[in-house]
């Protein structure tokens, strides 16, 4: 099932999205990991949403400011503005009478904290500390010297793996954590190699760690079944 190209508006402009599946019923809003991990997982995410569509569940894959095809410069972004656009997209779905479920991958799970979702499903979610640790490791590997504070505050803009990041954006991740509040269903799935607590661990290799973009159709099938069953339980 081929996705349809669409867009959505927010207070700062307009962003692109891919739309999958039916135009009625609950809808999944999938948020990719940030920065380089987005490139490595996008093909997998598209395959996952296609499989959900085959199971009768609609899906949206939005660009957020500074990512994908967005015209907003990444160096002008904060975590809040990324969350704001996802809230705007969620509100549009709610205005259409459709319940929404967030699917966040890795650091994408840090961006859906404003939206009024009926539930959240997270794959290998990162907290802000883990994200900053990964960014600092990449920054050091590029030949830079210094601790995390030097990376975050040593210049007006820091370049990490081709991404131009501001101190404001980096600081906004310092105490960030995936949304987990009473009253909102949340399911966490992690890889078997990840010892962190989860509702389920699955055997697979981490696509986000590969040097080049990749795919894992078997994992996409497994996770589509998991998400579909979880949404059905939430809707019951």
Language-model regions, residue ranges each:
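A domain-start/cap signature at the N-terminus of enzymes
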Residues: 1-6
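Short, surface-exposed "cap/lid" segments of acyl-processing enzymes
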Residues: 11-15, 19-63
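Cap/lid segment of the alpha/beta-hydrolase catalytic domain
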Residues: 40, 65-77
């Amino acid at each position: 099932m081929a996705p349809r190209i669409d867009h959505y508006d927010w207070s700062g402009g307009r962003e692109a999205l891919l739309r999958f599946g039916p135009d009625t019923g609950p809808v999944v809003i999938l948020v990719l990991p940030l920065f380089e991990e987005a490139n490595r997982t996008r093909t997998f995410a598209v395959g996952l949403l296609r499989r959900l569509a085959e199971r009768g569940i609609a899906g949206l894959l939005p660009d957020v400011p500074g990512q994908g095809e967005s015209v907003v410069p990444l160096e002008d972004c904060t975590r809040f503005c990324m969350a704001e656009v996802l809230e705007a997209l969620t509100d549009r779905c709610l205005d259409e009478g459709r319940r929404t479920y967030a699917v966040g991958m890795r650091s994408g799970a840090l961006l859906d904290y404003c939206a009024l979702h009926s539930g959240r499903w997270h794959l290998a979610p990162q907290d802000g500390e883990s994200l900053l640790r990964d960014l600092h490791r990449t920054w050091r590997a590029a030949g830079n010297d210094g601790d995390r504070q030097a990376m975050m505050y040593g210049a007006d803009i820091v370049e990490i793996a081709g991404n131009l990041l501001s101190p404001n954006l980096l600081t906004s991740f310092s105490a960030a954590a995936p949304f987990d509040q009473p009253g909102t269903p949340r399911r966490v799935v992690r890889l078997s190699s990840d010892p962190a607590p989860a509702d389920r661990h699955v055997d697979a290799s981490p696509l986000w760690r590969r040097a080049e973009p990749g795919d894992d159709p078997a994992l996409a099938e497994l996770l589509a079944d998991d998400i579909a069953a979880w949404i059905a339980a939430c809707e019951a």
